[in-house]
Design a protein with these regions (language model features):
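Short, charged, surface-exposed secondary-structure boundary motifs
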Residues: 6-9, 24, 175-182, 200-204, ...
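Extended catalytic core of nucleotide-activated donor transferases of GT-like folds
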Residues: 4, 80-81, 94-204, 218-223, ...
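Hydrophobic/aromatic beta-strand patches that form the interior of the parallel beta-sheet core
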Residues: 13, 123, 147, 167, ...
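Nucleotide-sugar donor-binding catalytic core of glycosyltransferases
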Residues: 45, 50, 57-90, 94-107, ...
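Non-catalytic N-terminal targeting/anchoring module and adjacent flexible stem/linker
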Residues: 1-105, 110, 114-118, 122, ...
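Active-site regions of enzymes building and remodeling cell-envelope glycoconjugates
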Residues: 3-18, 163-167, 187-189, 207-211, ...
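A short, gly/pro- and small-residue-rich
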Residues: 159-173, 250-259, 372-380
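Catalytic binding pocket for nucleotide-activated donors in carbohydrate/polymer assembly enzymes
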Residues: 93-95, 106-118, 123-127, 183-185, ...
Length: 454
């Protein structure tokens, strides 16, 4: 690809009077590359050869004057050179490992392909895209930025000292990560799936650029599929509700409080309980207390995930589930579980593409959106999800999504029965959901958000 963008080429026109845009860009690129590697070429005694080789090529194309003009322009215009260097600098994407069943690594591949599609240079940490380089080899070169997906490594001192931006998609509640965000500067962009996570990081760690940018989904080509043998599917694990993790009376009170207030965040619940008990503590003690409640909070998540499914199963609604964790389900309606082998990411997309309804229960993301929601919408199924502030704002209930309230789960079985009985309603919602998700919630959209931020 040409190093010069259209605006840079136009700037060159103003100097040279050239009207052939493609040719002008070509020779501006050659001139830029000469200046970029001038020190190395000089050191190896090859600069003169390179200049004459390019001049000979320009002569053969009848463009000698153009080449000379572009070379002089780039040699004498440091501002133009710097602009092109910034515009053509690569992103460095941290690919990660197979944590979370490979989902985070999948995200890294998705954003990489979207950036390349948009004309960006990309280097990946595993060498799967771009050139294979060591970080030590690029430290002194300009990067447009690092991109990671909950990449803890980007918070190490080595990266903190680097001046380029670090764009880090963040999915889990920051309360689980202690002081990881302490002392980060304005080169860090925390792209949180939940607005409350961004506010938490900003409030307690002083982050300047914590904002909401949820993950996106993949269109695997299933939206038009009419053969949907699965009525309602849930792709997720069956987790234990283990009340033995509750260590003292205060933790028990907190646990019971959150069970009866399922629409607030963990930190909101703690603040309310402290006010109710007339306890006044400083910020550090609050964070320490919240940190001590991690296991209790996970228990609350597991309690409501189980309760959502149990509500449907007990009402006689069959649910297709995947993975051997469901062998331990002992709640009501267990005979209505249809158990299958575990599935990977690609198989999950196919399952949703063969389903009428995809069920989603949040991991306590009260103002967020997950890739599961986007993937269900892009698969042609109806996404039936626990409501969040983000979904309330960005989607329309019974138009392109169907949401339910954890405080009123008694209504959920009738919602499912209506969707399964009313083909036209279900298909209309699914179609609208696909249109919306394909316009707003694919990785091309997230890549564009990062580029606009630059």
């Amino acid at each position: 690809d040409n190093a010069a963008g259209s605006s840079d080429v136009q700037e060159a026109y103003n100097v040279t009077g050239i009207s052939d845009e493609q040719t002008a860009a070509q020779f501006l690129t050659y001139a830029y590359v000469l200046k970029l590697y001038m020190k190395e070429l000089t050191h190896k005694g090859l600069l003169e050869n390179a200049i004459y080789a390019m001049k000979a090529y320009a002569d053969s194309k009848g463009c000698a004057d153009l080449y000379n003009g572009q070379l002089l322009e780039i040699l004498n215009n440091d501002e133009l050179f710097a602009k092109i260097k910034i515009n053509t600098a690569p992103f460095y994407v941290i690919m990660g490992d197979n944590t979370c069943h490979g989902v985070l690594r999948r995200f890294a591949g998705d954003i990489t392909r979207s950036l390349i599609k948009k004309g960006q240079a990309v280097i990946t940490s595993d060498g799967s895209y771009g050139m294979t380089v060591n970080l030590s080899d690029i430290e002194d070169n300009s990067l447009k930025g690092f991109i990671g997906f909950q990449s803890i490594v980007l918070f190490k001192d080595y990266f903190r000292k680097m001046k380029c931006p670090k764009y880090i998609f963040w999915f889990d509640n920051p309360m689980y990560f202690g002081n990881l965000f302490e002392g980060i500067d304005d080169k860090y962009y925390l792209l949180c799936q939940d607005r409350y996570y961004a506010e938490f990081i900003e409030e307690h760690f002083g982050a300047v650029n914590a904002l909401q940018l949820p993950p996106a989904g993949e269109d695997a080509g299933w939206a038009a599929n009419k053969d949907r043998p699965f009525d309602i599917v849930f792709i997720g694990a069956c987790n234990y509700v283990d009340e033995s993790v509750i260590k003292d009376e205060f933790q028990k009170e907190y646990y019971e409080y959150m069970k009866t207030h399922p629409n607030i965040t963990f930190e909101q619940g703690l603040k309310e309980l402290l006010v109710y008990k007339d306890f006044n503590i400083d910020e550090q003690k609050f964070l320490s207390l919240l940190d001590s409640l991690q296991d209790v909070c996970r228990n609350i998540v597991n309690y409501y995930r189980t309760k959502v499914l149990e509500t449907l199963l007990a009402a006689g609604i069959k649910i297709d589930v995947f993975g051997d964790t469901w062998d331990r389900y002992s709640g009501l309606g267990k005979d209505n579980l249809i158990k299958h082998d575990a599935v990977n990411v690609d198989e999950s997309l196919e399952i949703w593409g063969r389903s009428k309804i995809g069920l989603n229960v949040m991991t306590w993301h009260k103002a967020g959106m997950t890739e599961r929601i986007a993937n269900i919408c892009l698969s042609g199924a109806v996404c039936l999800s626990e409501r969040t502030e983000y979904l309330d704002r960005e989607f329309n209930n019974y138009e392109d999504i169907v949401t339910f309230n954890l405080e009123h789960l008694e209504k959920l079985p009738d919602v499912v029965r209506e969707l399964l009985a009313n083909d036209s309603l279900r298909e209309s919602i699914a179609q609208n959901a696909y249109i919306k998700a394909s316009k707003e919630h694919i990785w091309d959209n997230r890549a564009e958000s990062i580029l606009r931020g630059l």
